[in-house]
Amino acid sequence: MPSLRIEPGKLSGRIFIQPSKSMAHRLVLCALLAEGASEIDNIVLSDDIKATLGACESLGASVRIEDSTVFSGRKRVIITSKGQIRVVKPVIDCFESGTTARFIIPVSRLCADPVTLTGRGRLVTRPFDIYKSLLPGKGVNYTDEGGKMPIGLEGRLMPGDYDIRGDVSSQFISGLLMALPFLDEDSRIRITGPLESRPYVKMTIDTLKRFGITIEHSEDCSMFRISGRQKAAACSLAVEGDWSQAAFFCVLGAISGEVSIDGLNRDSLQGDRIILDIVRSMGARTVWNNGTLEISPGTLNSICVDASQCPDLVPAVAVAAALCPGESVIKNAQRLRLKESDRLSAVCSELNKLGARVEENRDGLVIHGVEHFTGAGVDGWNDHRIVMALAIASSRSTGPVEISGFEAVSKSYPEFWQDFRLLGGRIYEQHMG
């Protein structure tokens, strides 16, 4: 298996962050549901986005990909749809994209025709129990292989009341919010318990609004009222920069050298924008300069982070916390055990190989700061965020960090190693016998 050796050293410089994967998924799905031709600019063809584009084609849309004339090195995608779901390819490969699967399951049920969803890697065993329990009572025949993919679906989704726990992936709620407005009657979604990852649900509602779809909800997002018989209109939009991916470079700026990031929306609805508050609370200096975010190191101090609203930030934040004097705590992150890897175990295992002092508990991590990391061979766990976190850690290592499974970044951020090099990263691919 090939691995990547990263030589230690201070990193600094300027990058143009890649577009938001979360927003791109939502724009692409809304374009499928809208009548006419929608143009979505500033797209990077990560594996996850390829999966969602392929699903749109399977459900009746045509997809054309061109080079962007506005965003250098990026793509513009033109999605033409009749605004109605029709199954033209009965098997949809979701790759390893949980977002694709959780959005497509309810959206595909806007028609009665049978469809089968397949996946790869860990996605095959990731839980879809929420839909498995909800949909059979709403007109959908749902089958799987002992709780695993492939998932078979047949029948048209019915309007009505949907009750969902707030501590599950918000993608289940977003998927229903995308489908229910197109049914013949009104629906409601009731959330039991506090809604985690609330910003992602608000992003879904905002994206639907751009296509002419309205969703009413209570202030605490415990109740959503969805009028039926709505129609989505095609439109042209550009994807804003990705705060989830920028988080790794915000941490890099906090622990290594000054990093400048272009392409971010300061007022974004993306929940992971909270990374700025987190690195500032750790002692980093941040400033906006003519639309560019600049992060530089300060005197680091330990923190306590509630990850219930920003679970994707945990791998990056853990790297910074491992270098903060004293004890840091990351809590309410139990859903990370069901991601592309068990991220709590992965972070604990791999950072400890680099000399960190990380303890894992049921829903989080307790981290005792060290002065620096040590060189070692580490495993990326076939998880893009684990690989990127380990790469950032190398900037404060006393020896080379060698990552196996480094290719996992293609899932969400195929430009990552290019941007890492722009900041001075010295990387060398190794081939094992």
Residue ranges and their predicted role:
Residues M1-G433:
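Short, structured segments at the rim of ligand-binding sites
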